Amino acid sequence: MHHRKSGRHLNRTSAHRKAMLRNMAVSLFQHELIKTTLPKAKELRRVVEPLITLAKEDTVANRRLAFNRLRDDAIVTKLFKEIAPRHKERPGGYCRVLKYGFRNGDSAPMAIVELVDREESESSED
């Protein structure tokens, strides 16, 4: 039975899945918008949201916990100095998953994951 088992396996070993989600989280914090498959996007949300909540309080212990999950000093600094202060008043829901059609090769459902209060690019000057 598959009762009370949270999370998706994504057809990977646990080490591969953990590394993939870590890399995707680093990419999301770096670019603030990434495109991936829908199941990966939904799983990525479960990794990213607690990290932003952790980064709202800038302590050495929290920085070490974030570094333990991300393994990238520059991204941890960006998370604590740029990303978390933008979400200070928001009580959760820091990233948005938008459906983005289907991939050409295998018709996998695609999604865009973006941080909610990200700086808009120059293309949207309304």
UniProtKB/Swiss-Prot annotation:
Under NCBIfam families, the record lists: L17
Could you state one GO cellular component term attached to this entry? cytosolic large ribosomal subunit
- Keywords of the record: Ribonucleoprotein, Ribosomal protein
In terms of SUPFAM superfamilies, this protein maps to:
Prokaryotic ribosomal protein L17
The protein, known as: Large ribosomal subunit protein bL17
Q: Which GO terms describe its molecular function?
A: structural constituent of ribosome
Task: Say which domain of life the source belongs to.
Answer: Bacteria
Q: Which Pfam families match?
A: Ribosomal_L17
InterPro entries reported for this sequence: Ribosomal_bL17, Ribosomal_bL17_CS, Ribosomal_bL17_sf
Mind giving the lineage of the organism this protein is from?
Answer: Bacteria, Pseudomonadati, Pseudomonadota, Gammaproteobacteria, Legionellales
Q: What Gene Ontology terms for biological process does this UniProt record contain?
A: translation
Could you give the subunit structure recorded for this chain? Part of the 50S ribosomal subunit. Contacts protein L32.
State the similarity comment. Belongs to the bacterial ribosomal protein bL17 family.
Indicate yes or no for the key word Ribonucleoprotein: yes
Instruction: Cite the Gene3D superfamilies for this sequence.
Output: Ribosomal protein L17 (3.90.1030.10)
